[in-house]
A protein has these predicted regions:
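Single conserved hydrophobic/aromatic residue that forms the stacking wall/gate
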Residues: 206-216
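Catalytic or ion-translocation cores adjacent to nucleophile or general acid/base/metal-coordination motifs
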Residues: 22-196, 200
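Active-site phosphate/pyrophosphate-binding segments
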Residues: 198-208
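Structured, charged N-terminal subsegments at the starts of enzyme catalytic cores
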Residues: 1-25, 39, 43
Length: 216
């Protein structure tokens, strides 16, 4: 159950409420039981920035904690590439997506929750498209846990799966990329690299704000 435009904790909890109304969620001996797989989807720049805090609050909720126990402490999170690009532009969107994945992954590990990040990518570059294997290799080390999921948009289905040979090659590249990132050891300069990118984005933000003031 993907919750588009998740803005708050209540957006997630209301799914359990609706499930209870329609018999999809039950309580047995004080424990919540459901086949629903609740997947909050964060799409705007503001939501990507607030997602770690919202998830942290959600994990402290007793009802949701019972849901996680029912799912063997597993949580799936979806990130929207298309809307975040439309909202903040290519650079800001990718910066926010990268930071969000790092913080969410650290939060999951801290709370002993197994997780999978679902990448809602489009077909074009501006919508998060591109080669899947390179996209996997570029993900932060923190979220490389062997679990991954991503969308295949209609416009690229024929291109990637139109022939058995190309489809096989595409899947081989995905599996290869996954194996590479799982074997790759943590590098000490990863955090310094992230800090460097953060400084660049802050400088760009300052320049943008200064330009807005001059125009006004």
């Amino acid at each position: 159950y993907i919750i588009s435009m998740t803005h708050s904790k209540s957006d997630v909890l209301e799914v359990l409420f609706l499930g209870k109304l329609f018999g999809l969620v039950t309580c047995t001996r004080g424990s919540l039981v459901t086949d629903l797989n609740i997947v909050p989807l964060y799409e705007t720049i503001a939501d990507l920035e607030s997602a770690p805090k919202l998830l942290s609050d959600l994990f402290q909720d007793e009802l949701y904690d019972s849901y996680l126990n029912n799912k063997n402490r597993f949580q799936e999170i979806m990130l929207g590439y298309s809307d975040s690009n439309k909202d903040g532009g290519f650079g800001m969107a990718n910066f926010s997506l990268n930071n969000c994945q790092i913080k969410i992954s650290e939060l999951m590990i801290k709370n002993n929750i197994d997780f999978r990040i679902f990448h809602g990518r489009g077909g074009s570059i501006s919508r998060g498209g591109g080669k899947s294997n390179k996209a996997i290799l570029s993900l932060p080390d923190e979220c490389q846990n062997g679990n991954i999921r991503f969308t295949e948009q209609g416009e690229v289905v024929n291109y990637r799966y139109g022939s058995s040979q190309i489809a096989k090659r595409h899947l081989e590249q995905i599996v290869s990329a996954q194996l590479v990132v799982l074997e790759k050891s943590k590098k000490e300069d990863d955090k310094s690299s992230n800090n460097f990118i953060t400084q660049i984005m802050l400088c760009l933000l300052y320049t943008s704000d200064a330009a807005d003031e001059l125009r006004s």
